[in-house]
C-alpha cells in the first residue's frame, strides 16, 4: 500500500508515474503522506527485522527450521528488514523518520532488554539464539534511528557481525542436535 501511495504521489508531483527508486528519492512528499507511508513500511519491515513486539514468529521459525534454514534466516534474511529501513524509510521519508524516531528507539530498547531476558530463560538452544537475535537487532535499530552517520555505520557493522556469528551459532547448534538425536 505504501509503495502504491509513493507511486501515485510521485506521479502527481512530476507527471512521471514510476516505481524507480532513484526517481522516487527526488520527490518532496507532503508530511502527512510520509507519515502514512512510513507507518505502512514500518509494519512490514518491523515484522521482518523482527523488532519488539513483532518478534513472536522468530523463535518458533528457528525451532522448526532445519539447520541450514536457521543459518540463512539468521545470517541473511533478518537483515533485510534493517536494510529496508536504511534503503527506503530514511531517504524517502525523512520527516516521518524523524517523527517516528522516539517510538522506534523505545521499541528497540525494549527489544534489547526483553530479548536478553527471554534468551536467559530458554531451555532450547535454538530459542536462546533466536531471542538473542531479537536483542541484537534492537541494537541495530537503535543505531539506525540515532540518525547520524557514525551510528548508521555501527549498525551496518553490527548487521555483518550478527550475520556471521549467529549463522555460526546455528551451525554449532545443528551439530549438537545431530549428535544428541
List where the protein language model places each region:
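Hydrophobic transmembrane alpha-helices and their helix-loop junctions in integral membrane proteins
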Residues: 1-181
